[in-house]
From Swiss-Prot:
The gene is Spi1. It comes from Mus musculus. Its main location: nucleus. Keywords: Activator, Developmental protein, DNA-binding, Nucleus, Phosphoprotein, Proto-oncogene, RNA-binding, Transcription, Transcription regulation. This is Transcription factor PU.1. The modification Phosphoserine is found at S142, S148. SUPFAM superfamilies: Winged helix' DNA-binding domain (SSF46785). Residues 155-165 have a biased composition (Low complexity).
Length: 272
């Protein structure tokens, strides 16, 4: 028996009734809210909605009337593999959403490792501490290789040449400069003999800076000479033997060799 149907003015003829498969529209219809519940559920409950869909409504005896050529072979994919694939894709999407977006114009500055350092406060000395006694200055360490503080190591003056004479090519040293002042009596308010025969002399506590200033002019220094620098040069002479420190305050002693050379040069000076 043929069943004829009209559709938009065209006549459609159905196949023979022997090959006709009954189709129940209500059997395969599924409400839309089921699909929304599938999308909104978590990953663990997806498999329940997905794999129970066909097993709940479709029965094996309904497909017995279909010939073999009406079926399409599906790929053999196990449900656990599909669940793992879906969870992997879901985790990637969550990772993309959680990643903060950095503006392209934002520049990342280079971070420099911070290393803390300990800083000690600088202690300023009052004028009273700066003008300390010569014994306290003797306790401080002097540069081991320096003979004097910026002092030029010139040659010994030859016979007939006055120490510090203008136009002289020989550079005077500190102990020679002090010996000349003591023997000439110049600046006797700043330096004087304690024992001339032993070569012991002493500086004035009030006028020692004036003597140091004159020594700086004699050397031609650009920086101001102080007694502290001059005393350090005298202590360095204690290592070479020309001058040594005496226990008495601001007191020093020439060596016998320096006194002998000074006496020889004094005897050879031309008479006035």
């Amino acid at each position: 028996m043929l069943q004829a149907c009209k559709m938009e003015g065209f006549s459609l003829t159905a196949p023979p009734s022997d090959d006709l498969v009954t189709y129940d529209s209500e059997l395969y219809q599924r409400p839309m809210h089921d699909y929304y519940s599938f999308v909104g559920s978590d990953g663990e409950s997806h498999s329940d909605h997905y794999w129970d869909f066909s097993a709940h409504h479709v029965h094996n005896n309904e497909f017995e009337n279909f010939p073999e050529n009406h079926f399409t072979e599906l790929q053999s994919v196990q449900p656990p593999q599909l669940q793992q694939l879906y969870r992997h894709m879901e985790l990637e999407q969550m990772h993309v959403l959680d990643t903060p977006m950095v503006p392209p114009h934002t520049g990342l500055s280079h971070q420099v490792s911070y290393m803390p350092r300990m800083c000690f406060p600088y202690q300023t000395l009052s004028p009273a501490h700066q003008q300390s006694s010569d014994e306290e200055e003797g306790e401080r360490q002097s540069p081991p290789l320096e003979v004097s503080d910026g002092e030029a190591d010139g040659l010994e003056p030859g016979p007939g040449l006055l120490h510090g004479e203008t136009g002289s090519k020989k550079k005077i040293r500190l102990y020679q400069f002090l010996l000349d002042l003591l023997r000439s009596g110049d600046m006797k308010d700043s330096i004087w003999w304690v024992d001339k025969d032993k070569g012991t002399f002493q500086f004035s506590s009030k006028h020692k800076e004036a003597l140091a200033h004159r020594w700086g002019i004699q050397k031609g220094n650009r920086k101001k000479m102080t007694y502290q620098k001059m005393a350090r040069a005298l202590r360095n002479y204690g290592k070479t033997g020309e001058v040594k420190k005496v226990k008495k305050k601001l007191t020093y002693q020439f060596s016998g060799e320096v006194l002998g050379r000074g006496g020889l040069a004094e005897r050879r000076l031309p008479p006035h």
